[in-house]
Amino acid sequence: MAGLRNSGNSDKAQNDGKGVPSAYRGVRKRKWGKWVSEIREPGTKNRIWLGSFETPEMAATAYDVAAFHFRGREARLNFPELASSLPRPADSSSDSIRMAVHEATLCRTTEGTESAMQVDSSSSSNVAPTMVRLSPREIQAINESTLGSPTTMMHSTYDPMEFANDVEMNAWETYQSDFLWDP
């Protein structure tokens, strides 16, 4: 399968047959739906893996952080208007670049969430549930956790007889039984 190649000033992303091309530079979509980003180190054939992301915009922001670090003002960015606000890596190591990428995508996620809340704060019908995917190892760690065990609860400072608004349990039980069980 012949891949798409950048020609001249085209803004189309490259596709080497490994994923769906994107409108953003340095971004492609995997078959299973994740958006990924990577960049080539200048002067070498080495690539730096920037990560896997939920949206193409997050992946494009990741690319912009790395491209701006390596190429400065000469970089062809996906979001040139954000160049001055992008986090800067401490050095050119792949770990430093990924840390800056992580910070940038967190900021982008927060901005997207805040703007979505401002657009329609009166209705929750536009809010989609967030699915959290855990690895089998993370699930096992949660299952083996002692956070909710009786011994942990015995040693906690939580007083089950008192609620946050200072209503005592006996008063609550009386109040609850007055309207729940009466016909």
Swiss-Prot record:
Organism of provenance: Arabidopsis thaliana (Mouse-ear cress)
InterPro entries: AP2/ERF_dom (IPR001471), AP2/ERF_dom_sf (IPR036955), AP2/ERF_TF_ERF_subfamily (IPR051032), DNA-bd_dom_sf (IPR016177)
BP term (GO), one: ethylene-activated signaling pathway
Domain of life: Eukaryota
DNA-binding region positions on the chain: 23-80
Keywords, ordered alphabetically: Activator, DNA-binding, Ethylene signaling pathway, Nucleus, Transcription, Transcription regulation
GO terms for cellular component: nucleus
Job of this protein: Probably acts as a transcriptional activator. Binds to the GCC-box pathogenesis-related promoter element. May be involved in the regulation of gene expression by stress factors and by components of stress signal transduction pathways.
Protein name: Ethylene-responsive transcription factor ERF021
Name of the gene this protein is made from: ERF021
Pfam family, one: AP2
This protein's record includes keyword Transcription regulation: yes
Cellular compartment(s): Nucleus
Composition-biased stretches (Polar residues): 1-12
Region feature (Disordered): 1-25
SUPFAM superfamilies tied to this protein: DNA-binding domain
Similarity-based family: Belongs to the AP2/ERF transcription factor family. ERF subfamily.
An MF annotation (GO) of this entry: DNA-binding transcription factor activity
